[in-house]
Every structure is written in C-alpha cells, then in structure tokens.
C-alpha cells in the first residue's frame, strides 16, 4: 500500500517555501504520495497543481490579523480553508497522516477532525511561536502570549512525532512539549546545492563601488534590517568611507518602510532594496558580494533559531558577519565573524575587517562551503526526514 502524506503550511505558498517544498519533493522522490495545502501567493495562484510528483491545493491567504479578535479571525479563516481542502484531498488522493508546519501552532486542530479515520498528526516545528510573539510585541505576558504557550503545548500533545530545525528546538520539544527524545528528529533546513550555484561576479551591480555587502531574506519587522542601515551610515559618515555598496535582496511587509528610512538617512545611493527577485538575480547579487551579513538581532527567538540565509551564504562560499547568536554560531562556526549582539557599530567594524583582509575572507568562505557540502546540505540533512517517516509507516505496517 502507498505511504500517503498531507503537508499543511499556513503562512507561505509552495514551491516558494523552500523547506516545505524540499520535504514534499524528497518524500515524493522516495515513493511517497504527497499532497500540500498552502495559501496562494504572488506567482502561485492556481487552486490545484501537480508539480514534481506533488499534489498542491491552494486557498486564499487570510487577511493578517491585529489584536485578539483579528488574530482569531485570521486563524479561523485559515483553518476553515485547510479543513475544506483536506476533505477534498482525502477524497481525491488520500493520506495517512497530516504533517503540519507552523507558524501558527494550530494545524493539529485540522488533524483532530480526521483522527476517526486513523489519521495521525506529525509536527514540523519551524518557529517557536511564544518567543516569536515576545520578539514581535516586546512582552511575554497577557492573554495572547499565554495562548501561544497553550497552542504549542497542544501541538506536541497531539503529535505522533516531530521534526525540529535544530538542537535548541529539540530541547524545547522535550522540556516544554513533553516529547520523548527518540520522537523528535532534528531536520535542519539544508540548502540544495544545485539551486545555489557559484557563478562569476557582476561588477556592474556595485554601482561603481569597490566592495559589496550582500543580504538575503525576508524584509520584515523582526529581521533587524535597521542594523544594516546603521552600519552603512557609520561606515560612510563616521569612518568617511564611500567605497561600499549594500545589496539587500528580498521582499516582505517592512520593505517600503525601510526604503523610506534609507532615503531619509541619505543612503539610497549606496543601499539598494531589490524587493523579491527571481533566483538568477538573487544569485547575481550574492555571487557579487564580497561579504554577506545577517542582521537578526539577539532575542529569545533568534538566539534559538537557525536562519536559512546563513546556510545559503555558506553554500555560495561567502564570509559572513552576524551577531553572536547560539544557532547562528553553530551553523557558520569559522565561516563568520560575530559582532556584539545588537551593536550596529561593531557589525560595521567586522565588515571592514573582512573587506580589508580578502585572504581571510576567502578562507572563511571556503570553510563554510565545505561545511555545507559535507554536512549541512539537504542531501545530508534530509536523511532525518526519511528516517522519521520510515519508522512511522513501519509501525503502521506500511
């Protein structure tokens, strides 16, 4: 009998969500029947598609909530669509389990409605929602914060086993979620090397500057892009250097606000916000960069989270500057310099240190590339995905 898995992701469409798409296509390539339910997004508007062996069901993206009532409506709208499409998928394709990808921590509710049909819930822990709430709103109190803790607890209570992105998340699954260690699989979001190809630099991107600093990622309120602007301002106006171009690649809800801030700081001639761009343009920018930065500030969320951008920089052989965060340091190790937490001036100094020592930067980049090739690429990390599902289905006699 076929092993059938339904993956539900609430906040991003596939194939755009790299981790979820890699999971889905890896399972499909290994003989599983895989379906995905996700929201629609820019460029991903078809309600049904069959891509690379994966059935994709999409629903309209709910309006982003604000406040208790707004969040409740947003989550209810998403859950209603997920349940509607799950019923459709169960009838058309079928599934033995629902693999829920947070945030938010509510997809177990959909799985509960199929429990009478023998469907189990598998949790894929992408973000620690209580810490995300604290980072976003600056407090770890109140009804909404307590609701995040309750939802996380219920998620682990109802899941058969879990995938987590790193050891910090595994510790949370055990200590806060009450999971057994053997039921928590560390599935790191390793990059696929065929997607991240090292290519010749394109000097014209630098706008006539000698050096370039690159950034790739979501442009949101929690990503700390303001630290990059402050670092660029410090280098230009305090160190009196005007030979560095900053290329910030990615889209997100904070993009226009940061473009406005950049212009107000009179940095728009040396800092470019590209917005969301095709993969080839992203590769052009990162391959041209001399140094790449990660501006995620120190907080409880970021300190425990693995950022995909770090591994992508490493895959392209780039030396990195980032703040001193636990999981960021585990990923990059000797491929990065570590600035004092939330200190834009120290970040700027670390950037200059690497730009003025290109041989050291080259060695760091080679170290990072080798670490990804030999340990952290999806080819290696995906073994945990297959191990977890193979054990699960064998226990079901499938």
Q: What positions do the PLM features span?
A:
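N-terminal subdomain of nucleotide-sugar transferases
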Residues: 1-44, 48-56
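Conserved donor-binding/catalytic core segment of Leloir-type glycosyltransferases
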Residues: 6, 163, 206-232, 247
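Membrane-proximal helix-turn-helix segments that form the acceptor-binding/catalytic region
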Residues: 83-87, 106-109, 113-117, 129, ...
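Carbohydrate-associated surface elements
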Residues: 168, 189-190
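Acidic anion/phosphate-binding donor-loop and adjacent secondary structure
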Residues: 174-175, 182-183, 190-206, 224, ...
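Nucleotide-sugar-dependent
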Residues: 223, 280-284, 294-315, 321-331
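Nucleotide-activated donor-binding/catalytic signature segment of Leloir-type glycosyltransferases, i.e.
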Residues: 239, 249, 256-283
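Conserved acidic donor-binding segment of nucleotide-sugar-dependent glycosyltransferases
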Residues: 336-344, 353-359
């Amino acid at each position: 009998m076929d092993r059938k898995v339904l993956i539900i992701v609430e906040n991003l469409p596939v194939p755009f969500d790299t981790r979820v798409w890699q999971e889905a296509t890896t399972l499909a390539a290994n003989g599983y029947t895989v379906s995905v339910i996700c929201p629609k997004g820019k460029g991903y508007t078809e309600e049904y598609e069959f891509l690379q062996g994966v059935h994709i069901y999409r629903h309209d993206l709910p309006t982003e909530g604000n406040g208790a009532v707004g969040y409740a409506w947003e989550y209810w709208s998403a859950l209603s669509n997920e349940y509607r499409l799950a019923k459709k998928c169960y009838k058309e394709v079928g599934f033995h389990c629902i693999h829920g990808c947070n945030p938010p921590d509510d997809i177990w509710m959909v799985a509960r409605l199929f429990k009478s049909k023998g469907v189990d819930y598998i949790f894929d822990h992408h973000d620690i929602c209580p810490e995300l709430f604290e980072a976003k709103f600056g407090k770890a109190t109140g009804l909404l914060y307590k609701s995040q803790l309750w939802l996380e607890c219920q998620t682990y209570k109802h899941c058969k086993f879990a995938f987590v992105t790193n050891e910090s998340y595994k510790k949370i699954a055990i200590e806060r979620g009450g999971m057994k260690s053997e039921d928590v699989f560390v599935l790191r979001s390793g990059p696929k090397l065929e997607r991240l190809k090292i290519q010749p630099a394109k000097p014209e991107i630098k706008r006539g500057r000698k050096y370039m600093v690159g950034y790739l990622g979501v442009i949101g309120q929690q990503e700390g892009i303001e630290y990059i602007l402050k670092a660029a301002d410090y280098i230009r106006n305090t160190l009196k250097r005007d030979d560095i171009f900053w290329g910030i690649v990615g889209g997100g809800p904070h993009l226009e606000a940061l473009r406005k801030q950049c212009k107000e700081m009179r940095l728009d001639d040396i800092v470019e916000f590209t917005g969301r761009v095709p993969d080839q343009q992203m590769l052009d920018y990162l391959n041209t960069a001399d140094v790449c930065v990660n501006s995620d500030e120190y907080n409880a969320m970021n300190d425990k989270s693995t950022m995909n951008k770090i591994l992508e920089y490493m895959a392209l052989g780039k030396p990195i500057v980032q703040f001193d965060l636990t999981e960021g340091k585990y990923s990059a190790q000797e491929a990065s310099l570590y600035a004092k937490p939330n200190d834009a001036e120290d970040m700027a100094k670390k950037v200059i240190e690497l730009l003025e020592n290109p041989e050291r930067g080259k060695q760091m980049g080679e170290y990072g590339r080798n670490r990804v090739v030999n340990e952290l690429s999806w080819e290696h990390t995906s073994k945990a995905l297959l191990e977890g599902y193979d054990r699960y289905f064998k226990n079901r006699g499938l």
